[in-house]
Amino acid sequence: MNFSVITCPNGGTNQGLLPYLMALDQYQLEEFKLCLEPQQLMDFWSAPQGHFPRIPWANLRAADPLNLSFLLDEHFPKGQAWKVVLGIFQTMNLTSLCEKVRAEMKENVQTQELQDPTQEDLEMLEAAAGNMQTQGCQDPNQEELDELEEETGNVQAQGCQDPNQEEPEMLEEADHRRKYRENMKAELLETWDNISWPKDHVYIRNTSKDEHEELQRLLDPNRTRAQAQTIVLVGRAGVGKTTLAMQAMLHWANGVLFQQRFSYVFYLSCHKIRYMKETTFAELISLDWPDFDAPIEEFMSQPEKLLFIIDGFEEIIISESRSESLDDGSPCTDWYQELPVTKILHSLLKKELVPLATLLITIKTWFVRDLKASLVNPCFVQITGFTGDDLRVYFMRHFDDSSEVEKILQQLRKNETLFHSCSAPMVCWTVCSCLKQPKVRYYDLQSITQTTTSLYAYFFSNLFSTAEVDLADDSWPGQWRALCSLAIEGLWSMNFTFNKEDTEIEGLEVPFIDSLYEFNILQKINDCGGCTTFTHLSFQEFFAAMSFVLEEPREFPPHSTKPQEMKMLLQHVLLDKEAYWTPVVLFFFGLLNKNIARELEDTLHCKISPRVMEELLKWGEELGKAESASLQFHILRLFHCLHESQEEDFTKKMLGRIFEVDLNILEDEELQASSFCLKHCKRLNKLRLSVSSHILERDLEILETSKFDSRMHAWNSICSTLVTNENLHELDLSNSKLHASSVKGLCLALKNPRCKVQKLTCKSVTPEWVLQDLIIALQGNSKLTHLNFSSNKLGMTVPLILKALRHSACNLKYLCLEKCNLSAASCQDLALFLTSIQHVTRLCLGFNRLQDDGIKLLCAALTHPKCALERLELWFCQLAAPACKHLSDALLQNRSLTHLNLSKNSLRDEGVKFLCEALGRPDGNLQSLNLSGCSFTREGCGELANALSHNHNVKILDLGENDLQDDGVKLLCEALKPHRALHTLGLAKCNLTTACCQHLFSVLSSSKSLVNLNLLGNELDTDGVKMLCKALKKSTCRLQKLG
């Protein structure tokens, strides 16, 4: 088993200071934190300043009383922490709290005299460490020494004695505590013995040396002295969360772990207690106590020495979801108050009942979000289950031949979904049980492990093909329907535990249930009398999916809800993107495979309905009637589902109305699913394909040649879509990580004469040399009209790109090189490009340091008679007034340019004045001008107003984010009154007030062309808005959009 820490804030065991810290109000707490600075501590402590550790102020500032107590524990020895708190309280004149702290300090003196750490203490510590080494123990690390100080203030070594030797505390412990340990150990072993583990699974509960060390780290994941008080074990079903928690309990009961930290460990099974009625917390923790009364008062007197293990908390969340929430927000602190169990558990989680106790919680991944709100400073530990090495060990227990094991593992890695599922031991057992059957010799390994559904189907078929079950032949279909109904109803209600009444209601017969127990499909729950669960969640999910494909006595009768439920499931997964139902839907599609259906019918004596596929196709047609069906649902999930079916004809029909696909390929399973489905999207016209991982790169991690070859085969299949699909005209490869082999396949497809791609976008593609190969492949391509290479560091690649695009057969109309690290020198190549061809009409060069010198070169091209450029984007190119002079001169001669974007350049009033020399000509061709964020004022606005009064060809003008003020807009409005062309005006964030609204009112009332006006980010008060609204009501106002 393996686990990893996700996150853990500072937290730990505190020594009783928390109640006093919680008594401080907000302002007192802040003052207390300030007093913890070393310089402040010198005022009431005799030690020099350097004697005190400095607590990082960032930690102090954010700390609440609970975290503050942890910080004190972490940075001060026990005795010193108490004296520091007392000294600060005295400084703050908190007399009452001082008296209480002194009283408790006197009580503590009976067991240990509170004093400063002295040289004698340090010598004793070193001596003890030396004694441990002479006894054959490892040298303790700093964390262990810190724990010694924390536990006793003297010298005791935790975790360094022989694991089989009890600590001194164990030898002297009270009789009732010893009996409790023995009772817990006996119950744990009995529980494990009663679990119907599959063959060879018992070894999983044994603990190796490494796992023993992992258990030691479990309750201190960050290896800090201030240990976390709430640890949450998170993981998928069956990866070992409960097993790990039970191992921790068993080690404590055996006296080899957590001895000094915990006097008592309590196990609360949510399976069991969810059915309990109202009780008290004292009664709840006494359930598993031996024959005599539990020492509740002792528990209450040492709360920091208690560990509560809450196993399977999702059961409580599910129970709450079926009824009104019992957590009404009122705190629960009384151990003897009778309350619903869920209320008690929430109070325990919120640190209301036992604030100083440590909690260890296990929960399935899906439900973590519902748990977080109830926790105080939790630490989440991801339980990952079997590692690759664990899998190899497990498979070697089933297959003696190591070469056969490697062959199986190699094949499993091709199916990433199945391989990842094998982190759960029960799934491993399923795989091994299936592959060991004699029947497998008639099926190659690849077909059995091709999909997760195929493996499970063969597994269950093998179990029942020779099973002797005392059941009439005509009873089998009904029994399978009953089992599948139990599975799906449980998932609808998020129920994974079933009592006897549940199985009786579904009509499951005893012989059939016994066979399910025998084959480890179902399992009895020991701590919940008469309760049953599926041995692994994937079994329940498989049979839940099977409930939708089984033929009913009268197939889809009028009262049947199966078709509606099926569509609801698809809605959950494909539209709402809910992960909870994804495995069920995948199994559902997998069961549509004709070969799998035939196998199940022959061995399970059931009938698969042929109408299910018809219903699914109808649903697909309804969804596809939308204008852009692929935008409504998660297309990659649909691809996963169709790949699971492995039904080519069905897939082709389902994807017949898909016109646009957006794929982000991270894993091998996504690559394989895309390869399977894309070739069937015959009406696809736009493909966005992002390979955002190094999955196509052959490195040391991909040792198996067959796996790499499988990936490249899938990739080349995707590339072939560019050739075989005559409707595919747009390809977007942005944010892709490619490499030599993958680029080769892509280039071959783009060079193919049958490729119909017209628009190619390659933003942020790595590595940059990929673009060189692509542009070489595109050289002479007469179909390509749009090319976007923005957000790439082209550098020296620019001349090569432009040279290729100057090919006589090239028909490019749009070129975007925004944010490509271009410089003024690059403009020389761009100028040559613009004068060499006459079909490029739009050039986007924004976010490049072209500067004034670069624009001068470009403007020389704009005046060339062969330049046909219509749109030029030069936003944020570090231009100034000189650039405007060059542009103005060019505009006076150029007869094609109609759109110019100069936004985010510091042109200022001088630059605008230069532009207006060309803009003011009545025969000017410019129709759209963007000068937003160009740092000019009302003076520049006046120049624009004068120019517009002579030129009525400008239709779009954006002047936003300039300091125009009301006076500037007044001049502009006077020019716009007779203007007959302007339909869009941008004045966002221009420091306008209500004073300008009268002028805007006049324009809105008279203009017959203005339909869009942007005034966002200006301080227009109610009167100004009312004036604008008055204009909108006039019949002469043509405005359609006001921002």
From Swiss-Prot:
CDD domains: Pyrin_NALPs (cd08320)
Protein name (database record): NACHT, LRR and PYD domains-containing protein 13
Domain NACHT: residue ranges: 229-558
UniProt LRR repeat ranges: 725-749, 781-804, 837-864, 894-917, 923-946, 951-978, 1007-1030
A molecular function (GO) term: ATP binding
Pyrin domain: residues covered: 1-107
Keyword hit for Cytoplasm: no
Residues engaged in binding ATP: 235-242
